[in-house]
């Protein structure tokens, strides 16, 4: 298994990142460079999360080998244990003269991990600090040529890059003027990594303090169906306002595009730029603008009334932003409608005596084998109406305990004697028994929980609502690039902070132990002692203050006072928005119900009259065959008596007989007769037999 686990995880993580990108992105419509950059960013960040536990278990094994070698070189002496050593014996691994080191199942040979981490780390840093911000500006640029887009992207990122260069230059000057330090390439590299990790840790603590409280509370609130439904009504009212604003903004921008489209004809030099703008517009607007277009117009006499290329670039950027905003709000509205309708269905089915879950609307996708045989309506009722709320409550309690452990460990991870960090205690207990599988699973679950708290916060806070990850291929390119940039920026300091929690970072724990390969790539933080001994230790304690503020919803109350309406339980404005959202969802439900009823009626009519047409055609075919057979038998049997029953034996006589036999009776009581073949398909003309829907009895004025 030497290196096999590493190779397997590299392949599995790649397909995981590809699957998630396919779920959220659109391979057919979005640019290849956007998809490639996002895939690479996600892949590298997922590699750090999945491979770091293997690095931890391998480091523990190598440390065991070092301790074993040190014991064999020193004589066996029975030490006298002090009270402090005895007290810490339950935490630190027991030392014996005959210590046996067991190789982990996922052992990675020496020399592989440093190269691997160096490639992963520096590639992700190039993506997050250089390429992805540039690609974001390039994708939103209004330029019509590659050169114009590159120029615009460089101008927009000048302040962005200048800020980081200023921070790096300040740290470089600080180190250069220090008399005890002699700068080398390794130390310069460490300064750059320290600057990036410091900025990442600054954002990390702010986001983590909110997520540690909000995620357990969100699951607890999800177990209360009534509260969740009321909150959904509130979100619907706010989202409808934003949706209407985006539609109005799109209409205004499309009006400007229409005016320019009518003024600039096909022989104008800027017409190709206008065509580029039109291709970014929604299809319905493209069709409207393409109807009243002349082929040629002399523009030499009206040169001053035409827009410039710069104004077209500005309009192009406005079109891109307006279309993205409109699509984002439209997708959010559809997702919110599905959630609200589902919650209303759950509320209705809770009082059902049949114990079968009934949906208000048919599912858009056909029912698969899972819902047909396993997740039946009865199983769905028990899950949605009984088990789900209790499962969410238990999960909320577990996550709350996990959050408390994280907060405690963040405040005490710098203490090594005694060991106060809970995660360090658990890892050292498993290290004593060489339970490498437990170590790797504990590391992965902890890192995954921290990543969830951090990343979900960005997409939950209202200020960051511009970025939205929507499934079913509905995420725009800007949100994909932002997510990749954010993951690459926060994952390395998050994992470094985790190594400090479990005392695997010697710069924080100050223990003479073998470092992980990941920590060795980060360099020694002792180059900047005020960061290693100050900021990295005391700044994470700010999580306590942030968690308390989040628990009492201080941020929500402040935003509400500033005019940003937030969900507050006892507030008049909140009650008005809840009522408005309830009415909006009632209208949408009636609208969707009418559409579904109309489709059902059309389907029934098509099935009914398609079957009647099929039966009528089958009857006509069988009757025609029977008549032809009877006529043939009669003709053969009465060949000698042909003159007795016919006036002549000519071919014209037989043809007239066949025409009379094939003719079908007409309904002269029918009000109208039509020869339109399209009406016969709709059931109005079914073989001459379904032309009248009136009664067959005589009317008063039939003889007039």
Swiss-Prot record:
Region ranges (Disordered): 613-654, 672-704
Membrane topology listed for this record: Multi-pass membrane protein
InterPro entries cross-referenced by the UniProt entry: GPCR-associated_LMBR1 (IPR051584), LMBR1-like_membr_prot (IPR006876)
Pfam families, per the entry: LMBR1
Keywords, alphabetical: Cell membrane, Coiled coil, Glycoprotein, Membrane, Transmembrane, Transmembrane helix
Coiled coil: 235-266, 576-612
Membrane-spanning parts: 4-21, 34-54, 112-132, 158-178, 193-213, 394-414, 439-459, 482-502, 528-548
GO biological process: adrenergic receptor signaling pathway
Compositional bias (Polar residues): 631-654
Regions of this protein lying in the Extracellular compartment: 1-3, 55-111, 179-192, 415-438, 503-527
Tagged with keyword Transcription: no
Residues bearing carbohydrate: 88
Record flagged with keyword Cell division: no
GO cellular-component term (any): membrane
Entry similarity comment: Belongs to the LIMR family.
Name of this protein: G-protein coupled receptor-associated protein LMBRD2B
Organism: Danio rerio (Zebrafish)
Lineage: Eukaryota, Metazoa, Chordata, Craniata, Vertebrata
